[in-house]
């Protein structure tokens, strides 16, 4: 287990960093990525933007790689996934930013929600409150959502010849470390799917 991310606050930072990496690299995002050391400035924003568009957005709904859980898990049906995700978010009174037209099943939205759960867990532990509801929610969310579609997504991502290919192992390690920290057995949850 990676001891650098073996606490909820560090986990939240890891999820937020991953969310930045998989966000559209506009000028503001590029600034944050380079300032935080997440991307080598020598790569160039235009190069990263072209890779992002070519990998995730070209061809509309038939892009090479989809950042949407519902499109990565067609056997579950996107409508059902969206409804379940919205219930998750609503249970914790988390609202999507309507101005940015966020989708509940977008990878960045799921990463940001996991970061939020980790921060709530951290605050509960810091304040001497019960953190178990947030730990249980994170475990359940990982099993039902992100960890259910990440392995296939990651395999396809790592097969690309893009900058984004290098993010797959980091994201996979973060999720597996979090699951291990929560006491979830990765193989067991895969068998439940």
Curated annotation (Swiss-Prot):
Protein name: Chlorate reductase assembly chaperone protein
Biotechnological exploitation: Has potential use in bioremediation of waste sites contaminated with chlorate, such as pulp and paper industry wastewater.
GO cellular component: cytoplasm
Gene3D superfamilies reported for this sequence: TorD-like
Source organism, top-level taxon: Bacteria
Secretion signal, residue range per the UniProt entry: none
Keyword set includes Glycoprotein: no
Keywords: Chaperone, Cytoplasm
Disulfide partners: none
SUPFAM superfamilies in UniProt: TorD-like (SSF89155)
Organism of provenance: Ideonella dechloratans
A Pfam family hit: Nitrate_red_del
Similarity comment text for this entry: Belongs to the type II DMSO reductase enzyme chaperone family.
Main localization category: cytoplasm
Transmembrane segments: none
NCBIfam families assigned: DMSO_red_II_cha
Biological role: May function as a system-specific chaperone protein essential for the assembly of an active chlorate reductase ClrABC.
Keyword Cytoplasm set for record: yes
InterPro entries cross-referenced by the UniProt entry: DMSO/NO3_reduct_chaperone (IPR020945), DMSO_Rdtase_II_chaperone (IPR017843), TorD-like_sf (IPR036411), TorD/DmsD_chaperones (IPR050289)
Subcellular location: Cytoplasm
């Amino acid at each position: 287990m990676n001891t650098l991310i073996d606490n909820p606050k560090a986990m939240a930072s890891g999820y937020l960093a991953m969310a930045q990496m998989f966000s559209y690299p506009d000028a503001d995002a590029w600034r944050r990525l380079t300032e935080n050391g997440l991307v080598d400035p020598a790569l160039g924003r235009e190069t990263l933007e072209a890779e992002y568009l070519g990998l995730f957005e070209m061809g509309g709904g038939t892009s090479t790689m989809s950042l949407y859980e519902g499109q990565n898990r067609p056997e579950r049906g996107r409508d059902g996934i969206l409804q379940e995700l919205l219930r998750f978010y609503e249970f914790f009174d988390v609202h999507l930013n309507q101005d940015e037209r966020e989708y509940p099943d977008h990878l960045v939205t799921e990463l940001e929600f996991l970061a939020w759960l980790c921060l709530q867990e951290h605050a509960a532990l810091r304040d001497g409150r019960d953190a178990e509801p947030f730990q249980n929610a994170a475990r359940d969310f990982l099993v039902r959502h992100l960890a259910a579609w990440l392995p296939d997504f990651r395999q396809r991502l790592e097969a690309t010849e893009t900058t984004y290919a290098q993010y797959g192992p980091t994201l996979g390690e973060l999720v597996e470390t979090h699951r291990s920290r929560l006491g979830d057995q990765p193989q067991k949850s895969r068998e439940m799917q």
